[in-house]
Structure formats: C-alpha cells, structure tokens
C-alpha cells in the first residue's frame, strides 16, 4: 500500500502498514490498524512524498554498513597489537574529550536528521535503561509521522555521524600523529558503538529494528509483539546480571 497522509488543524495522520495519528492539541500519538479507516475517509488522504528516494536510502545504508565493517576490522587488528595500559592523566583527558564530542554529535545527528524531514524533537535527557544502564537520549516522538525509511535514517544518523568522524580521525591519526591516546579513544568508543548497534536495551539498533519491521514498543508489557517482548526480557536479564556482578564485586 502507498504511503498516505492527512492533516488538519487538529490531527496529523500517516498511513503505512498501520495508521499513526498525532493529536496536535494534546501532543499524544495513537496507532490503529488499516481497517480502522473507511473508504470514504481514505478519499481525504493525499500521497505522502518522501524526502529521500529509495536509491538514496539504500546508498546511505550501504555506506554506513561499509564504515562499520572497516571500523570493526581495524578495531580487531588494534586489539591484537596495541597496549591496553592507560598512560597517565593526559590520555584520560583525550579519551574523555573524545567521548563527550562524539556523544554530543551523536545526539545532534538524531536532532538534525529529524529536522531535515520537517519534524522536531521533544527533549534531550539522561536516563537509566532498565534502571541500571546509563544513557543519553533524544526523545523523537515525531518519527511516528515519518515513513519507515525516514524513521530508519533518523535512528541511524547518530551512528552514521560517529562512524564517519572516528574513522576519519583514526585514518588521519595513523598517517600523521600516531597518537596512542587517540587510538585508544577510538578503540573504546568503537566498542561502545557496537553495543549501541545490538538491538537490546533501547539502543539505536533496537529502534532501527523496530522501524524496519514496522513494530512499536508499548508501555503495557503484554501488548507488545513477541519479538519486542523477547528483546525486553533479554534486557531485563542483562540488567539483573549486571547488578549481581556489581554486588559480588563490591562484596569481594
């Protein structure tokens, strides 16, 4: 089915696999099945024109995948050859600055990719996923009113910015500065990005997977699709496992 859109002063509605409704007054979002719309109602809808072509979308995915593969290959080589010792406070300063810069640019990537599609973010914040794992986040409720491909781009763009930046910096570093501190920062942040790609713990990988499969996460646990439930259970298991290990480490 083609992507359809309807908008008036009260509501914004997008139709793709499901019916997504934004109540402009309350700021609430709703999701209904396709059969909730009558043929008469569908006559009021217009074709939704995506801002990026399918060709550009797949080119974007391919380039991001290539950056990830090259990053991972280089990371494995470095892990086999670089010393794991942290040399003094200067290295720690570089690593901290490296992380802060990448975290800020990551969230800006989400924000400005959403703005590119004519939508706005809700808020930026800090939270504990499953009450254990710390994470910065940008609330992107307006992605509900984007097409599937556009949602994927928004959720992936933070990672795209990170891989583009750290791969470029590491390439320059290898041929010029040969700074072990920069390489160590590259290794640590690359490992962090791997966790963000794995579709668990409310990661970007998790949001990309849900967008790809046209699924959503609901606040009521039992309402969710079995795949979402499985991922949530794995997340709870990881959280419990981490807490137990931290307690054992402190006690011992």
Curated annotation (Swiss-Prot):
Alphabetical keyword list: Cell membrane, Hydrolase, Membrane, Metal-binding, Metalloprotease, Protease, Transmembrane, Transmembrane helix, Zinc
Enzyme active site: 107
Biological process (GO), any one: proteolysis
Main location (coarse class): membrane
Bilayer topology: Multi-pass membrane protein
Molecular functions (GO terms): metal ion binding; metallopeptidase activity
Subcellular location: Cell membrane
Keyword Cell division set for record: no
Record family assignment: Belongs to the peptidase M50B family.
Protein name (database record): Putative peptide zinc metalloprotease protein YydH
Organism: Bacillus subtilis (strain 168)
